[in-house]
Amino acid sequence: SLMNMMYNKATGTVMILDNSTTGMTGHQDHAATGKTLLGEPTYAIDIPALCRAIGVKNVVEVNAFDIEKLEKVVKEEVAKDEVSVIITKSPCVLLDKSKKPVYIAHEDKCKKCGMCMKPGCPAMTRNVDGTIHIDDTMCTGCGLCETLCKFEAIELVEAGDR
């Protein structure tokens, strides 16, 4: 579809969500990872270079969890009157075995505004009184909830294994 956009002189912004796996087929490596399905080293497709090779001038890579920068980039790119590509990069949270941060919600600081619930994180639920609870067994440690909370009701407490 990106090639057709370029060929037909369309406008618009395409987002490529690159977490170094093919999620729809069960966490398999894809052509940009540099590994075959058997885990053997192979040539890695350079996604930004591929986009540029078909004529896309505006190709931006951004960390998927850097919300402020991502929001800024999206606003800039959708305002352009030509095709642009935003590539969000972040490892698949289900395959990343590194130590994860542990977040807790301070119910006494929670203003019940719901901003932290906007991403739809399955680890976040509301208590009966409307305050937030974080299930640490489901939390992937991405920190989006802490970033979105303007009342410091969500806190990083330690790093631990998940």
Question: Which residues fall in each region the model found?
Answer:
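Thiamine diphosphate
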Residues: S1-I87, S98
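Glycine/aspartate-rich loop-and-adjacent alpha/beta segment that forms the canonical ThDP
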Residues: E76-N127
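Iron-sulfur cluster-binding cysteine motifs and their immediate structural context
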Residues: Y103, K111-H133, T140, L144-D161
